[in-house]
Amino acid sequence: MNEFFRDDIFNRPQNVVDFRFDERTAAVFPDMIHRSIPAYASLLHMLGVIAGTYVQEGDHIYDLGCSLGGATLSLSRFIPKTAHITAVDSSPAMVQRFRAYVEGAALHHIEVLEADIIHLPLKSSRVIVMNFVLQFIPPPARDALIAKIYQALTEGGILLLAEKTQPEDDLLRTWHEAFKASQGYSALAIAQKREALENVMKIETETAERVRLQAAGFRRVLPYFQGMMFKAWVAIK
């Protein structure tokens, strides 16, 4: 994939603006996400493992909000070679980088689209993945998006959903900041990134996430990952 760098976006004092998934973010995103989400590599591995127990020959899969394709590439390791993945993101910088990688690696079973998932028509799919994306969707649009995903899934299909949630205890927030500090982020960088995300990332409680999934019609919602406030569920149609 294109060259990546260590995340130092918020290292220096600055007039903080709203967080954007632009080229500056895309250039450091792999480093940023692994240093920000505890056990992120384990989450990617497990979603691939779980999807592999569902996906059959010729099935279709979506990775909605794919960024640089971490989930897509994990899926590819565990699904049949005849399955097809459509990876979607609204960030031109993310799409350009991931599409260049897919084409360079001749991964013909992966299609990379630049689109707004709120408005994108979804075709029938066995598995849909959405990792840390719903939290960036305007809250009034979330119910309709989950309902659309439910309708697109085949009977018995699954949504693999991961989100940062409101902490049940303030200790979790303290521990998460300690984790980021252990990854080399300064107190200034942590504070400035928090400020940048304040208006664009609206997190909810785990209960709210579950209620939305159940209201859409999912018959079972099972947890499969937790790293402090970062949680993931399998929602089964």
Swiss-Prot record:
Per the record, the domain of life is: Bacteria
The EC number on file is 2.1.3.-
Provide the binding site for S-adenosyl-L-methionine: 40, 65-67, 116-117, 131, 194
- Classification via SUPFAM superfamilies: S-adenosyl-L-methionine-dependent methyltransferases (SSF53335)
Keywords, alphabetical = S-adenosyl-L-methionine, Transferase
Reaction equations catalysed: prephenate + S-adenosyl-L-methionine = carboxy-S-adenosyl-L-methionine + 3-phenylpyruvate + H2O
Alphabetized InterPro entries for the sequence: CmoA, Methyltransf_25, SAM-dependent_MTases_sf
EC class, as a word, reads transferase
- Homology family: Belongs to the class I-like SAM-binding methyltransferase superfamily. Cx-SAM synthase family.
Q: What does this protein do?
A: Catalyzes the conversion of S-adenosyl-L-methionine (SAM) to carboxy-S-adenosyl-L-methionine (Cx-SAM).
Quaternary structure (record)? Homodimer.
Q: What is this protein called?
A: Carboxy-S-adenosyl-L-methionine synthase
This protein's species is Dichelobacter nodosus (strain VCS1703A)
Classification from the root reads:
Bacteria, Pseudomonadati, Pseudomonadota, Gammaproteobacteria, Cardiobacteriales
